Curated annotation (Swiss-Prot):
The keyword Nucleotidyltransferase does not apply. One of its GO terms (molecular function) is mRNA 5'-UTR binding. HAMAP family: FlbT. This is Probable flagellum biosynthesis repressor protein FlbT. It comes from the Bacteria. Keywords: Bacterial flagellum biogenesis, Repressor, RNA-binding. GO terms for biological process: bacterial-type flagellum organization; mRNA catabolic process; negative regulation of bacterial-type flagellum assembly. The keyword Cytoplasm does not apply. Belongs to the FlbT family.
Length: 145
């Protein structure tokens, strides 16, 4: 971050800053004056919600941001996941996005990597939805509907 960055939080909201969890008891505005890794509560993905390939990738990167002390242990898992996704997806926008995520993580821009992954969710949903429709059509044909 090159400039200051201001965010507003509502009473009871949490923010994760450089691995620390901060909960506010009233509406506040925070201004970050230097580089900081943070994640708003609304962007935290719960383990049970990591139910698609990109959400699983997001969860891995999120762990790196929320627990920076364990980031080195998480990197091999991230590399394996990225390699698998790059080998599996055929959509050019997803592939370009995954390569961008990889470069952002390598540059230490973890929050930006999370934003880039979230931006790929709609494309992934289109792909998964088309796959589900195809499966349903095959099943219907097989059972004579």
């Amino acid at each position: 971050m090159k400039n200051t960055f201001r965010i507003s939080l509502k009473a009871g909201e949490k923010i994760y800053v450089n691995g620390a969890v901060i909960k506010v008891d009233r509406k506040v505005s925070l201004e970050f004056l230097n580089d900081v890794q943070f994640l708003l509560q609304q962007h935290v993905l719960q383990p049970e919600d990591a139910n698609t390939p990109l959400r699983q990738l997001y969860f891995i990167v999120q762990v790196m941001l929320m627990g920076p002390e364990g980031a080195d242990k998480t990197r091999p898992l991230l590399k394996d996941m990225l390699d698998n996704l790059l080998a599996t997806f055929r959509n050019e926008r997803i592939l370009a996005g995954l390569k961008h995520v990889d470069s952002l993580v390598c540059e230490g821009q973890i929050y930006e990597a999370l934003k880039a992954i979230r931006a790929l969710y709609p494309i992934e949903e289109e792909i998964l939805s088309a796959g589900r429709q195809q499966e349903q059509a095959i099943f219907a044909k097989a059972v004579g509907e």
